[in-house]
């Protein structure tokens, strides 16, 4: 029982926000690509596969991140009690866990077409080099965005077995979304990060955080408008984006206090709701 508890803690499965932020772009890409005039069984099946894949790969990514960061985590108040940093789980055991999770994720992946499988495998280096970026650049959140939103492109390919401008624009927009919300998240640890020498966009833009996050979210919002235009969505889609705009611009940014770690966590977690809102936006565009 204790081992199960440690495994859940290690993989953050008790904190669904992580894998949901990985899953939402997958669902967006799947929804925008799918023909809802056809039977829905495939849509539900692929949605389930992408959810499972998100959970498995997020879990594996957390383990790799904790292995790489174990010496840093020991020095940060919020992370010092993580299983690897605290010595409750050995690095050897953690590596075995990550291989098992990747193996299970591959079993999920082989349900898709060959193009999707190939593109997914090509993204693996991105997924496992991200934890190193905070040592070398102030832009680790950018690399997280590139990695976390790759599923949007994969989902499109899984339906169409090809790619065009729509998922590419949406993908780049979603990268800015992640860049924004993970910058907010980073302000929880900014004091410790500055002491131990870890880099982040939170540190780089600490003097103008709202301006930078606003630019990120505006870029994401503009990508939604462009996608709607390219997809020939009706006016109902663009009207529904008002809710998305208010969530990003007013709820998340207007009253944001980056010096308040609890508020930063709340604003960060609210992006799970934002993911749902954008999904509904796309459904409106596709169906209504």
Where do the protein language model's features map onto the residues?
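Cytosolic, membrane-interface loops and tails of multi-pass inner-membrane proteins
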Residues: 1-7, 62-89, 183-206, 254-263
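Intramembrane alpha-helical segments
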Residues: 4-9, 28, 59, 79-169, ...
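Alpha-helical transmembrane segments of integral membrane proteins
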Residues: 5, 17-21, 41, 45-49, ...
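Membrane interfacial helix-start motif at the N-side
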Residues: 5-18, 88, 134, 200-213, ...
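Small-residue-rich segments of transmembrane alpha-helices in multi-pass membrane proteins
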Residues: 20-30, 83, 144-157, 204, ...
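Membrane-embedded alpha-helical segments that form the functional core of polytopic membrane enzymes
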Residues: 23-27, 31-68, 78, 102-110, ...
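Multi-pass membrane catalytic core of lipid/isoprenoid biosynthesis enzymes
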Residues: 49-54, 70-120, 176, 195-238, ...
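Extended hydrophobic alpha-helices typical of membrane-associated regions
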Residues: 222, 226-288
